[in-house]
Structure formats: C-alpha cells, structure tokens
Amino acid sequence: MQRPDMSVAVAGIKMRNPVMTASGTFGYGAEFADYLDLESIGAMISKGLSLKPKAGNPTPRIVETPGGMLNAIGLQNVGIDAFIEQKLPYLKNVNTPVIVNLYGNTLEEYGEVAARLDGLAGVAGIEVNISCPNVKQGGIVFGTDPGAAQEVVRLVKKNTSKPMIVKLSPNVTDVVVMAKACADAGADALSLINTLTGMAIDLERRRPVLANVTGGLSGPAIKPVALRMVWQVGKAVKLPLIGIGGIMNGRDALEFMLAGATAVQVGTASFLDPSAAQRIAREMEQYLADHNIESVSSLIGALEL
C-alpha cells in the first residue's frame, strides 16, 4: 500500500496533515524550530495578538492539576505591529500555513487587528478568539453572548478577506447555539474548545494558587468534554471543525476526526514534549498505514452510532 494521504483543507487552507499547533502553546513558531521540523505539521497558529502589546497577568500564572494544567497568562503578546515587523518575516520562509490568532477587548479592536492582517503575504488565515471580556458591556465575554459573538464575526469578515476560523468557548450553556450564531454571521470554520474555567487552592496558605484566582483548564482532563462538543456541533452546522482539547497522541487526534473534526490542534502536549505536534502527525499516519486506510479525510465524521 502507498503512504496514506494525510492532506486536509480547512476553509480553503490546504495542509499536509491535520495537525495544527494551538494558540498560546507554540510561541510565534520560531521558538520551536530547534525541537521539530516546522514543515512536518499542518499549520502553525500564533499566540493571540491584540492591537497593542500586552504584559499579561501577574505570576504565578501556571499550575499543574491532575490530568492537565491551569493557565492565567492573560494573553500576553507583542502586539500586531511588532508581530508583522519582527515575527512574520521568519514565518514567511517556512513552507507551512501560518494562521494568526487575534483578540480584542472591544468590538472595534477586533476589527482593527483584522484590518491590519488583510492582504498580508504569509498569513494564510485568522483565528478569532471570542473568549474575551467586552469592556464596553460590563465585562461580558463575547463568546458567551450569541449577539456579541455575531457582531465580532461580522466585523472581522468585513475587514479581511482571509479565511476566518472562530474559536469557541466551552463555558456556555449550549455550545451549539454559539456555533450556529458564528456560522450565521459568516465564520468559515470553527475551532473548539478553548479552555474550561477552573481554579486551584493552596490548602496550607488558604489562598488561590494563581494570582488571577481562576485560569483556563487544558490537557487530557478536558478531552471528553471537547469530543462531546465537537460531535454536537458537527451534527448542527455545516462548517469545517478543528478539534482541540487534551490531544496527547495520534489516537486522540483520530478520535476527534471521527467525532467530526477536519483537523486538530495540539496545545498542552507541546509543553511536555516540544516535538509533540510532529510526533502526533507521524502516529496518525502510522495508524492509517497499520489499518490500510488510504486517506485521513475518510475518517472525518465517520463515527458509527
């Protein structure tokens, strides 16, 4: 048998395999070049970028938990202008699609960051993080309010012709409602899930471990929740889905594809093993070869009930 066909496409972004790196776990890409071949993975996603540089939250802001970790980094980043000037030139020379994750604390901020990216060579697409508080609306998170999420998606769509992936929060009553809202507003693809809100407590000090008190839970602990949400959304909307949440090996990734994902993102695994994304792509291909499966795309949504 020939080598399995590992290629997939998400919203017109063609990838050599379904493995993408999750925003905030892979720096700006160059930081991982010593640990894996950047041209062995499907796509790279940048840290979340805002209009202006952001320092993030005070420390401690990461803590290990059973089956995962909590982070309260606070979306620290260099800002969109510094990314374009200092980070993007390196990435343009890597033959792997670069997707820029962006966020804002106001509707206008989302629109402005998207506009800066429009027409930029070297940016294959954008991923919109809607898990941010709307400072003009009392801090309600965009991604928990269907109306607010739609406003963001519509404005970003208006300001850029790049393919747009919208990253969904799991911290909602019904993820399908949010998925449909984003799809109706013009999203080209959906990625899910972002982190679940959690906290850790230091019993001896009787204080929260994180300076921010709460943080985002990621890692294997959230995988069953993520799989369920991908499956639910896949039945409800006709957009390509990217599965995220606790993917540590090739089998995990393929489970997300059976649930309905076209591609996956590897995040927390990269902290434990900086070459995780490349290894997972290799493990997926090996599974297909071992089971005489010709194409990875044949597994998308192939869950049998």
From Swiss-Prot:
Q: Which residues bind substrate?
A: 47, 71-75, 129, 194-195
Q: Which UniProt keywords apply?
A: Cytoplasm, Flavoprotein, FMN, NAD, Oxidoreductase, Pyrimidine biosynthesis
Q: According to its UniProt record, which residues of this chain constitute the active site?
A: 132 (nucleophile)
Q: Which InterPro entries match?
A: Aldolase_TIM, DHO_dehydrogenase, DHOD_1B, Dihydroorotate_DH_1, Dihydroorotate_DH_1_2, Dihydroorotate_DH_cat, Dihydroorotate_DH_CS, Dihydroorotate_DH_I
**Pathway membership of this protein?**
Pyrimidine metabolism; UMP biosynthesis via de novo pathway; orotate from (S)-dihydroorotate (NAD(+) route): step 1/1
Uppermost EC category: oxidoreductase
Localisation per UniProt entry: Cytoplasm
Source organism, top-level taxon: Bacteria
Q: Which SUPFAM superfamilies match?
A: FMN-linked oxidoreductases (SSF51395)
State how the cofactor is bound: Binds 1 FMN per subunit.
Q: Which GO terms describe its molecular function?
A: dihydroorotate dehydrogenase (NAD+) activity
A GO biological-process term: 'de novo' UMP biosynthetic process
Main localisation:
cytoplasm
User: What functional role does this protein have?
Assistant: Catalyzes the conversion of dihydroorotate to orotate with NAD(+) as electron acceptor.
> What interactions and quaternary structure are annotated?
Heterotetramer of 2 PyrK and 2 PyrD type B subunits.
Q: Family membership, please give it.
A: Belongs to the dihydroorotate dehydrogenase family. Type 1 subfamily.
Q: What is this protein called?
A: Dihydroorotate dehydrogenase B (NAD(+)), catalytic subunit
Native organism is Geobacter sp. (strain M21)
Provide the organism lineage as a comma list.
Bacteria, Pseudomonadati, Thermodesulfobacteriota, Desulfuromonadia, Geobacterales
